[in-house]
């Protein structure tokens, strides 16, 4: 099946960050086979031609760190620091989860993400009360591209920890794939919730199965102090000593990193999922993304969970990310719009090991989203496309979402998930949680 999308303004995110006016994209099954400007002559003998009527077309957004199973916890635990938020709000509520509630919560997060333009994401879920196979089936049904990882903790007894490692290894062996729509990573929660033995086992599983690692690291000053007091090393050095960085690793946050650590992480291909809104809301601080990029680190933007954000709007994250860097450095040139867009598209895709997506180029997967600026005053005049995408647009502006060549959202309507049912069930299950 060949489909051509014509009469579009195309934000390619190629090496030149080229914006093509009055262009077209040809998709064959799940791949982009041509991207050009001008009138379409049907040289490829396509099956369908769709007039985009001047819509902006850009790569699907890539969210590098989420917790979609937590989506029912939106608004619970506002105005709290990370540790009390986890210990008195999030973990007690997660302990009440059932398989049915976890699916309803996941569906809500997936619906919010895809309708706001996210096409790919990397997720960590707490396995307590969760049917992991049902979660993977739910993500698959959504049509999204994802790395969904089972989180490991050292809570309970040593036997509990051993069982957690065994279950996580089975999960990795079942779901890890080098390519395709769904995969997984090895995901120890953090250095403050995992023993040294567990982190070493996670490193072993990652090496033996050739997977990536996903971990919360250097998120707060308290974490750095506590790990240094307990192990005599800062979190980065401690994680390295456990062998975690033998495989490409995504660290969520990286708020508290010094110059030497940034250089070390760049050398060891450790990437950062930058969560600006979540870090601000939890009072964790502001990650120095400008310095990370200057050190050669790979960085991708993320939302974290709705419990700490409180939405999954990647446009908002792009805007906050660039404004924060300008503010903390007192440098208006820090993190310009092209860089912010890169960190939410092709750069983010590289961070989570999905190089097949993130830009609109021949050979890439057909993952793209559209915005119709014609009826939106906040996107007018419509000629400054890149600026408007970062500084003015929001997820609510999305018209269409195409993932792997399939129309997942069309004219604002999700084709893969039952929006009315999901919203109804979210409210019903939320009422059952004991706060």
From Swiss-Prot:
Which terms does the record give in the GO molecular function aspect? 5'-methylthioadenosine deaminase activity; metal ion binding; S-adenosylhomocysteine deaminase activity
Record text on cofactor binding: Binds 1 zinc ion per subunit.
Keyword vocabulary terms for this entry: Hydrolase, Metal-binding, Zinc
Q: Which InterPro entries match?
A: Amidohydro-rel (IPR006680), Deaminase_MtaD/DadD (IPR023512), Metal-dep_hydrolase_composite (IPR011059), Metal_Hydrolase (IPR032466), MTA/SAH_deaminase (IPR050287)
Q: Which SUPFAM superfamilies match?
A: Composite domain of metallo-dependent hydrolases, Metallo-dependent hydrolases
Cofactors needed by this protein, per the record, are: Zn(2+)
Q: What class of enzyme is it?
A: hydrolase
Which residues take part in binding substrate?
Answer: 94, 150, 189, 219, 304
Q: Where does Zn(2+) bind?
A: 65, 67, 216, 304
Its EC number is 3.5.4.28, 3.5.4.31
Under catalytic activity, the entry for this protein gives: S-adenosyl-L-homocysteine + H2O + H(+) = S-inosyl-L-homocysteine + NH4(+); S-methyl-5'-thioadenosine + H2O + H(+) = S-methyl-5'-thioinosine + NH4(+)
Give the protein family. Answer: Belongs to the metallo-dependent hydrolases superfamily. MTA/SAH deaminase family.
What is this protein's function?
Catalyzes the deamination of 5-methylthioadenosine and S-adenosyl-L-homocysteine into 5-methylthioinosine and S-inosyl-L-homocysteine, respectively. Is also able to deaminate adenosine.
Name of the protein described by the UniProt record? 5-methylthioadenosine/S-adenosylhomocysteine deaminase
Q: Which organism is it from?
A: Bacillus cereus (strain G9842)
Lineage start: Bacteria, Bacillati, Bacillota, Bacilli, Bacillales
What gene does this protein come from? Answer: mtaD
């Amino acid at each position: 099946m060949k489909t051509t999308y014509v009469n579009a303004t195309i934000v390619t995110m190629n090496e030149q960050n080229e914006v093509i006016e009055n262009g077209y994209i040809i998709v064959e099954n799940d791949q982009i086979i041509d991207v050009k400007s001008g009138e379409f002559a049907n040289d490829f003998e396509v099956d369908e031609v769709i007039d985009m009527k001047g819509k902006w077309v850009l790569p699907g957004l890539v969210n590098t760190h989420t917790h979609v199973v937590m989506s029912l916890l939106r608004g619970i635990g506002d105005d709290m620091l990370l540790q009390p938020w986890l210990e008195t709000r999030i973990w007690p509520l997660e302990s009440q989860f059932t398989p049915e509630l976890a699916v309803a919560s996941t569906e809500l997060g997936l619906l919010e993400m895809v309708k706001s333009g996210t096409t790919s994401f990397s997720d960590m879920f707490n396995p307590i009360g969760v049917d992991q196979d049902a979660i993977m089936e739910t993500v698959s049904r959504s049509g999204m591209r994802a790395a969904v990882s089972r989180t490991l903790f050292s809570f309970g007894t040593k036997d509990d920890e051993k069982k957690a490692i065994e279950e996580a290894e089975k999960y990795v062996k079942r779901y890890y794939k080098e390519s395709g729509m769904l995969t997984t990573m090895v995901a120890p929660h953090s250095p403050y919730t995992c023993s040294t033995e567990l982190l070493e086992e996670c490193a072993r599983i990652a090496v033996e199965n050739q997977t990536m690692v996903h971990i919360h690291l250097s998120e707060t000053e308290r974490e750095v102090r506590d790990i240094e007091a307990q192990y005599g090393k800062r979190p980065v050095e401690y994680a390295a000593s456990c062998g975690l960085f033998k495989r490409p690793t995504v660290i969520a946050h990286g708020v508290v990193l010094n110059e030497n650590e940034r250089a070390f992480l760049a050398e060891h291909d450790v990437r950062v999922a930058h969560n600006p809104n979540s870090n601000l809301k939890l009072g964790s601080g502001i990650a120095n993304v400008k310095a990370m990029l200057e050190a050669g680190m790979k960085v991708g933007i993320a939302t974290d969970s709705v419990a700490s954000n409180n939405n999954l709007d990647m446009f908002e994250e792009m805007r906050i990310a660039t404004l924060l860097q300008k503010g903390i450095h007192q440098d208006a040139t820090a993190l310009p719009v092209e860089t912010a867009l890169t960190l939410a598209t092709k750069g983010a895709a590289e961070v989570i090991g999905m190089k097949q997506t993130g830009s609109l180029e021949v050979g890439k997967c057909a993952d793209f989203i559209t915005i119709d600026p014609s009826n939106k005053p906040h996107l007018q005049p419509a000629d400054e496309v890149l600026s408007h995408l970062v500084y003015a647009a929001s997820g609510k502006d999305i018209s269409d979402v195409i993932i792997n060549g399939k129309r997942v959202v069309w004219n604002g309507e999700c084709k893969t998930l039952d929006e009315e049912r999901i919203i109804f069930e979210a409210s019903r299950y939320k009422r059952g949680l004991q706060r």
